Regions:
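Cys/His-clustered metal-coordination modules, chiefly Zn-binding fingers
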Residues: 196-292
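Interaction interfaces in information-processing and related assembly proteins
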Residues: 1-228
């Protein structure tokens, strides 16, 4: 099953919903960053959320950034997404290993206590930025809390990544259910009742259920209406020219030191780990264009 996001409404527009399957996307991230199982699960959950939240944005140029910064061994997780289903991300310490907690990967322990920041760049003078504390550091609950506190939108977020025995991704995905301001009390009660039928996202995905079927469990008795589907993938738009800007940003003195060393340098993109080499001649050319 290729990765995709489903968008839907229910209860005559009182509810909007998103669901996604993201196995290939999360596996691509794992391959790019060579992440440990717990790092894959943490990054995969945030990537899945980023893909769905990105699809909420209206314009082609809109960009979303999600940052989780905790005091656990992972350090931090950064994800960016556009409105077209393209998402990328990285974790500060990809090789962290932790013992399981209650038979599951200990994402909360790996992330630790900290903050979630959501930045939306929608082409306005200033990007929108909202920040909340991590309530469980398991990602889904933290986003539920963020939506309620920072955006005043009562929501339910479910995210999951299941690893295979060979440490590749067996399945991944998630859902976001949001109440509109005019949602009736009985609609909310019905969704709360329906949520009892969802054990975990990965339980349903590993049985072969689709995002549409997961939404049907959650909203099928509330007039579920699928409005659109869109593909989603791990995609990094880095290039040698873009990474060059990072080299320029270190300043003339640092670049001159690199030239004096007489060695080629290698710079890696944070988001996809692609390495770009710059020869001494290229560094001299960069130095000429450096302002400071």
């Amino acid at each position: 099953m290729n990765d995709y996001i489903v968008r839907a409404t229910a209860a005559d527009g009182q509810v909007r919903a998103f669901a996604a399957t993201t196995k290939e996307l999360v596996e691509a991230a794992r391959e790019h960053h060579n992440t440990s199982p717990v790092a894959t699960a943490a990054l995969g959950r945030l990537l899945t959320a980023g893909a769905m939240m990105g699809s909420m944005m209206k314009n082609d140029t809109d960009m979303l950034t999600l940052q989780v910064r905790g005091d656990g061994p992972l350090g931090g997780i950064t994800v960016t997404a556009d409105s077209k289903g393209d998402v990328k991300g990285y974790v500060n310490h990809p090789d962290v290993m932790l013992p399981p907690k209650n038979g599951k990967l200990d994402v909360g322990g790996a992330v630790g206590i900290g903050l979630l920041q959501v930045i939306k760049d929608m082409g306005l003078k200033e990007p929108y930025s909202g920040q909340t504390i991590l309530v469980s550091s398991e990602i889904a609950e933290d986003l539920t809390y963020y939506f309620a506190v920072s955006e005043q939108v009562p929501s339910v977020v479910g995210l999951g990544v299941l690893m295979d025995k060979d440490n590749t991704v067996a399945c991944a995905g998630g859902f976001i259910i949001q109440m509109m301001p005019f949602a009736k009390e009985e609609t909310i009660s019905q969704i709360e009742e329906n949520l009892k039928n969802i054990t975990s996202v990965t339980d349903h995905l590993k049985k072969g259920e689709t995002p549409e079927q997961i939404l049907k469990i959650l909203l099928g008795n509330l007039g579920l209406e699928i409005t659109s589907t869109m593909p989603t993938k791990f995609y990094c738009n880095c290039s040698k020219e873009r990474v060059e800007k990072a080299v320029i940003s270190v300043g003339k003195k640092e670049i001159q030191d690199m030239i004096d060393d007489g060695q080629d340098i290698e710079v890696k993109c944070h988001f996809c780990n692609t390495a770009y080499k710059y020869s001494v001649e290229e560094l001299k050319d960069i130095l000429k264009r450096c302002k400071r």
